[in-house]
Swiss-Prot record:
Residues 37-61, 89-112 bind DNA. SUPFAM superfamilies: Homeodomain-like. It comes from Oryza sativa subsp. japonica. The gene is MYB4. PANTHER family: MYB FAMILY TRANSCRIPTION FACTOR, TRANSCRIPTION FACTOR MYB15. This is Transcription factor MYB4.
Length: 257
């Protein structure tokens, strides 16, 4: 069997009920009851579907419906039945005379569920707070590291020796670098002075050409074939012979120079 078409395809009304529709529904149910909700709208002369008539009767038009707030006993009963039945609101409403499933569902979502969630959230916060209190354990690690035993004197002495040796090696390197730079500068100065002196005293070819081209007329350099070349006396030789003549008394016979 197929499902009956919805209200829109059959031209039925939807939306809020009017007071006239409520009176027609109540009068029909009081006379004939509500054995078949699907056939009831046609029998009562209402342009409504069977589901809409049933919900209107159960939730609003029943004469035994309780109005007002739920008592403490009713709320405890709803909580207990919800733990057993879950969201079966019609079954829960059957255990509570005068209360509709719609009212029970509304009071559950607006009040009772929040009341039950508050302690759970508090426990969750407490659990998270307990975890936060456990975090300082990690803070003990730096303290343990700080409380480690100090280094032995031998290690400290060896470290100081190594540091001093490194410092001395660095100083020696700097000293050697300074000495090498100073020696390099001295060599450069000597080379520059040598080059300047060589440039000052450099004799070119013109000097020798001028010397060789000088005339020899003024010099009596005639030599006989048998004579040997005698070097001219030097100043030391002249002083020597002059001293000899002075001692022998023959210096008076020498001509005046």
């Amino acid at each position: 069997m197929g499902r009956a078409p919805c209200c829109e395809k059959m031209g039925l009304k939807k939306g809020p009920w009017t007071p006239e529709e409520d009176k027609v529904l109540v009068a029909h149910i009081q006379r004939h009851g509500h054995g078949n909700w699907r056939a009831l709208p046609k029998q009562a002369g209402l342009l409504r579907c069977g589901k809409s008539c049933r919900l209107r009767w159960i939730n609003y038009l029943r004469p035994d419906i309780k109005r007002g707030n739920f008592s403490k006993e009713e709320e405890d009963t709803i909580i207990h039945l919800h733990e057993l039945l879950g969201n079966r609101w019609s079954a829960i409403a059957a255990r509570l005379p005068g209360r509709t499933d719609n009212e029970i569902k509304n009071v559950w979502h607006t009040h009772l569920k929040k009341r039950l969630d508050a302690p759970a959230q508090g426990g969750h916060v407490a659990a998270s707070g307990g975890k936060k209190h456990k975090k300082p354990k990690s803070a003990k690690k730096p303290a343990a590291a700080a409380a480690a035993p100090p280094a032995s004197p031998e290690r400290s002495a060896s470290s100081s020796v190594t540091e001093s040796s490194m410092a001395s090696s660095v100083a020696e390197e700097h000293g050697n670098a300074g000495i090498s730079s100073a020696s390099a500068s001295v060599c450069a100065k000597e080379e520059s002075s040598f080059t300047s002196a060589s440039e000052e005293f450099q004799i070119d070819d013109s000097f020798w050409s001028e010397t060789l081209s000088m005339p020899l007329d003024g010099y009596d350099v005639s030599m006989e074939p048998g004579d040997a070349f005698v070097a001219p006396p030097s100043a030391d030789d002249m002083d020597y012979w002059l001293g000899v003549f002075m001692e022998s008394g023959e210096a008076q016979d020498l001509p005046q120079i």
